[in-house]
């Protein structure tokens, strides 16, 4: 018998095919609170993604954020004090880190904020970002969240709109990159 491990398997429709999704909660490992395996397909590609939760900033998230935000997009201030209090998700494909997201609670707005959402370039357009945010939403829903906020790059706002986020207010610049605040009511 596996100690402190629950497995639930169910089916969900992805890209017009039935795929299996396995959710596993592993309380045995302190760094890995839980993880899920998602299966999706894009054209001829089949990707299996495993999502792990962390209470401290993992090196795999640092790697992804440096690749996407620092090297690719030229941000200089990628890491901040929120990294000290946030919860992190990292998505793995065949054991390699490919996507990440951080989650923190903003008491001033009484809202959970998703941020530093990044998917490595070769994996964009494969629904891995959607799967990662679905898991992030499940995490905050379990904490009785009523709303989620995101400071989105304007070029990615359409992606977030497909997930139910709504633009709020005016665009603003973060490190010379246009952003828009978005919210989703749960």
Q: Where do the PLM segments sit?
A:
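A short beta-loop-alpha structural element at the N-terminal edge
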Residues: 46-61
């Amino acid at each position: 018998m596996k100690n402190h491990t629950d497995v639930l398997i169910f089916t969900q429709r992805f890209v017009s095919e039935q795929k299996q999704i396995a959710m596993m909660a592993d309380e045995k490992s302190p760094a890995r609170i839980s993880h899920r395996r998602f299966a999706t397909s894009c054209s001829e590609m089949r990707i299996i993604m495993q999502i792990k939760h962390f209470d401290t900033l993992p090196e795999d998230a640092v790697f992804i954020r440096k690749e996407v935000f620092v090297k690719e997009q030229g941000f200089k201030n990628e890491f901040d004090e929120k990294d000290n209090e946030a919860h992190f998700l990292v998505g793995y494909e065949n054991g390699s880190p490919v996507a990440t997201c951080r989650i923190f609670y903003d008491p001033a707005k009484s809202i959970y904020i998703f941020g530093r959402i990044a998917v490595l370039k070769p994996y964009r357009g494969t629904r891995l970002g959607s799967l990662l945010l679905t898991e992030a939403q499940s995490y905050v829903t379990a904490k009785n969240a009523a709303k989620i906020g995101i400071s989105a790059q304007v070029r990615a706002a359409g992606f977030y709109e497909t997930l139910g986020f709504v633009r709020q207010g005016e665009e603003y610049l973060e490190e010379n990159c246009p952003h828009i605040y978005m919210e989703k009511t749960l």
